[in-house]
């Protein structure tokens, strides 16, 4: 049964249930079961995981099957990655460390995007709602519409590229927020442009290096 599920072949799974319907007792999921599945799998595993791939880091390019070994997000911060994956990241085998899909951004793009999100909300709520609705409808709302099953035959991160682009708007605003804050708080005129230049160098340079 597990092998059939992992293959993602719904027809074979349905045939298996029909063939052994006298053996398997399949209970109809309740409303709360469906709600739990939506949040834990469709929202968390099939959306938030992809978002964090792009702005925190990615474990490898092997399709995830809700396991600790493949397809998870990682940050490059050892104790966080150990907590998330369930095992230390210090002595990984070479095939894991050298996987072409392995990226670590240390939360930098995500944090910069969150700074931009809160900055836009505090400075112009009307514009914030426009960007937020776009982010919502190209992300979580799309997951509700697609109603994905377990397990898909391949990763579905490409369907969410609009949501990632929208979050990138907040990353740009995060840079401007830092500039505005430093310009207001620090009297030295060259400090704010220097810090902004550092942000522009560190975050994109880290992503390009990976």
Regions found by a protein language model. Name each.
Residues 118-121, 136-154:
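Transmembrane-helix signature of polytopic, lipid-linked glycan biosynthesis machinery
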Residues 106-125, 177:
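Hydrophobic, aromatic-rich transmembrane alpha-helices
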Residues 152-176:
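Hydrophobic/aromatic-rich transmembrane helices and adjacent perimembrane loops
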Residues 1-112:
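Lumenal/periplasmic acceptor-binding loop at the mouth of the active site in multi-pass
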Residues 102, 127, 144-161, 210:
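Membrane-interface catalytic loops of GT-C/OST-like multi-pass glycosylation enzymes that act
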Residues 124, 168-192:
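Membrane-interface junctions at the ends of membrane-embedded or membrane-associated helices
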Residues 190-210:
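Transmembrane alpha-helical segments
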């Amino acid at each position: 049964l597990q092998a059939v599920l992992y293959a993602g072949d719904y027809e074979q799974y349905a045939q298996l249930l029909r063939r052994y319907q006298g053996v398997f007792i399949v209970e109809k999921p309740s409303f709360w079961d469906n709600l739990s599945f939506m949040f834990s799998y469709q929202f968390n595993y099939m959306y938030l995981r992809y978002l964090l791939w792009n702005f925190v880091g990615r474990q490898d390019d092997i399709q995830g099957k809700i396991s600790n070994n493949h397809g998870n997000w990682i940050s490059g911060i050892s104790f966080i990655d150990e907590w998330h994956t369930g095992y230390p990241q210090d002595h990984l085998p070479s095939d894991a460390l050298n996987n072409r899909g392995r990226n670590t951004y240390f939360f930098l793009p995500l944090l910069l995007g969150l700074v931009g999100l809160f900055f836009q909300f505090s400075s112009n709520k009307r514009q914030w709602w426009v960007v937020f609705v776009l982010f919502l409808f190209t992300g979580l709302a799309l997951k509700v519409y697609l109603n994905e099953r377990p397990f898909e035959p391949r990763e579905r991160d490409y369907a969410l590229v609009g949501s990632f682009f929208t979050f990138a708007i907040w990353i740009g605003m995060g840079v401007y927020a830092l500039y505005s804050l430093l310009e207001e708080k620090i009297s030295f005129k060259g400090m704010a442009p220097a810090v902004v230049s550092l942000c522009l160098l560190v975050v994109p340079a880290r992503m390009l290096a990976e």
